[in-house]
């Protein structure tokens, strides 16, 4: 988005709903992987980085869950098993629960 105008729809940022539409269309997969020494990592996949700022979403989740994490490629990795709480947080951010598995 450049200078207050959305590059996708051409509307001002205040009226743009591109991000809301993108949230409704995405199929998100939340899973827990085991790493070395029995550590668990919650991985959130299926997010489109062109429509949504993954860094901001990651920062929001890390602060709400009080954990560390990172953005790797098109996924967010959070330290620990936070699967249920991540689904609740995504729902509060406007993602449809039916599209989260």
Curated annotation (Swiss-Prot):
One of its GO terms (biological process) is translation reinitiation. Keywords: Protein biosynthesis, Translation regulation. InterPro entries: DENR/SUI1_TIF, SUI1, SUI1_arc, SUI1_arc_bac, SUI1_dom_sf. This is Protein translation factor SUI1 homolog. The lineage of its organism: Archaea, Methanobacteriati, Methanobacteriota, Stenosarchaea group, Methanomicrobia. One of its GO terms (molecular function) is translation initiation factor activity. HAMAP family: SUI1 (MF_00604). PROSITE patterns: SUI1. Belongs to the SUI1 family. Gene3D superfamilies: SUI1-like domain.
